[in-house]
């Protein structure tokens, strides 16, 4: 393995690749305000557009270099990766444009962070580049936005708290999105479309996506914990006594988030436990209409997944592109500022102790909040080497930099608190 990179070995600490896209611009803006003395460059296909973006950023960004790089030109990606310690990328859908950059970073020993919500892209990244990244010392970290930081880091925080208390391994663990305001980004929709397109074209891909452990290192050593449905219909009281009266529905992002969390457990040598079970739900409230809303939403979600994963290929591409948000577009600043999310994760440990982790953040989850999360992942990889794990390869946020992110969250406006319930 290569020796850890030092600042003197690379020209830049962070390169923001895709800075002309909507979330790319937001991420660059966040780094211009929060990055301090970090050496940052902007990269993409069009130097003119990158210069225009740079002009909209704060004074600290006006000297940031501009790099030309294109997924269609592997040599440009290789050059970019060789010049920086970390690349953060918002260029998606990742199944179309992501692997050449993963390859460049894995070869150069360069750390990488993205926003992908595409399970099969992550699976291919693992299969093709995990070993090489281990050998070169690169950390290839997927899922560094709303997909799947709140899920991944909430469970990691619970693990750390239970470990500190000597309360034993985590058992049944349930994430519940309690509050949410904001839109789904065009990039997230594009990722979902790519997943549906791939699964409807290939039954083997569909079977892999249905496997709860499709992203783990060694499928053969995963425990048999029985059915683990992705979009369950559950009453709140069946999750935790504190949720009595609340009704929930399946959370669409669970199809991806749950796989990331289970991969974290595997990468951390099953630190959460061999009997760790994980599921996600979304609250629909406690009103008189909530039971009906819960049942209808759950049926609708399962129907969308079942039909989309089998028949999406029959929809004309132009029709789909006309009716969904386009990647690179997004809401107004006022809308982004008004958004928020709050999620609670409940767990019961092997000793019977019960814990709750609550994570919350102001800002539209798909845009402002995601840009902060991605920016903080880039800063953690570049600056907090002493707090990163010893793992290299294709990783998750918790496995790569769980402790570093826990330390960074408060200053970034992300609250993540754990309490013991019993």
Which role fits each region the language model picked out?
Residues 36-49:
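Conserved glycine-rich Rossmann-like NAD(P)H-binding loop of the short-chain dehydrogenase/reductase
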Residues 12-33:
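N-terminal Rossmann NAD(P)H-binding glycine-rich loop of SDR-like oxidoreductase domains
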Residues 93-213, 263:
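Glycine-/Pro-rich loop/turn segments that contact NAD(P) or position catalytic residues
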Residues 30-37, 268-270:
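A short, Lys/Arg-enriched amphipathic alpha-helix followed by its capping loop at the start of a domain
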Residues 2-7, 160-422:
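C-terminal catalytic/substrate-binding lobe primarily of soluble NAD(P)-dependent oxidoreductases
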Residues 67-86, 90-96:
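Conserved Rossmann-fold cofactor-binding substructure of NAD(P)-dependent oxidoreductases
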Residues 13, 85-86, 111:
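Structural motif
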Residues 53-62:
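Short, conserved SAM-binding/catalytic segment
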């Amino acid at each position: 393995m290569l020796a850890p990179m030092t600042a003197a070995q690379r020209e830049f600490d962070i390169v923001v690749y895709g800075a002309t896209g909507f979330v790319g611009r937001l991420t660059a803006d966040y780094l211009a305000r929060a990055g301090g003395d970090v050496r940052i460059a902007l990269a993409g296909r069009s130097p003119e557009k990158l210069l225009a973006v740079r002009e909209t950023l704060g004074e600290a960004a006006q000297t940031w270099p501009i790099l030309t790089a294109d997924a269609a030109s592997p040599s440009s990606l290789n050059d970019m990766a060789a010049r920086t310690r970390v690349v953060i990328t918002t260029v998606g859908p990742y199944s179309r444009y992501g692997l050449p950059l993963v390859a460049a970073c894995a070869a150069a020993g360069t750390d990488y962070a993205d926003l992908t919500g595409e399970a099969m892209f992550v699976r291919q990244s693992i299969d093709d580049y995990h070993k090489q990244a281990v050998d070169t010392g690169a950390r290839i970290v997927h899922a560094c936005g709303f997909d799947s930081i709140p899920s991944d880091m909430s469970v990691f925080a619970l693990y750390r708290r239970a470990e500190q208390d000597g309360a034993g391994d985590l058992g049944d663990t349930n994430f519940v999105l309690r509050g949410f305001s904001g839109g789904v980004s065009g990039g997230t929709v594009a990722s979902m479309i790519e997943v549906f397109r791939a699964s409807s074209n290939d039954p083997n891909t569909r079977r892999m996506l249905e496997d709860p452990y499709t992203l783990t290192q060694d499928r053969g050593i995963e425990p048999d914990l029985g059915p683990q449905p992705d979009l369950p219909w559950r009453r709140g009281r069946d999750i935790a006594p504190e949720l009595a009266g609340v009704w929930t529905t399946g959370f669409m992002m669970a199809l991806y988030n749950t796989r990331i969390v289970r991969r974290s457990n595997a990468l951390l040598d099953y630190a959460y436990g061999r009997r760790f079970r994980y599921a996600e739900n979304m609250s629909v409230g406690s009103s008189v209409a909530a039971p009906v809303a819960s049942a209808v939403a759950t049926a609708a979600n399962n129907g969308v997944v079942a039909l989309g994963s089998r028949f999406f290929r029959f929809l004309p591409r132009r029709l789909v592109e006309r009716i969904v948000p386009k990647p690179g577009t997004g809401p107004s600043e006022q809308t982004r500022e008004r958004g928020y999310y709050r999620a609670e994760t409940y767990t019961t440990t092997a000793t019977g102790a019960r814990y709750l982790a609550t994570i919350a953040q102001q800002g539209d989850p798909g845009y402002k909040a995601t840009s902060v999360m991605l920016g903080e992942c880039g800063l953690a990889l570049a600056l907090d080497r002493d707090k990163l794990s010893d793992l290299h390869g294709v990783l998750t946020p918790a496995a790569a930099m769980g402790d570093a992110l826990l330390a960074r969250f408060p200053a970034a406006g992300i609250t993540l608190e754990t309490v013991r319930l019993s």
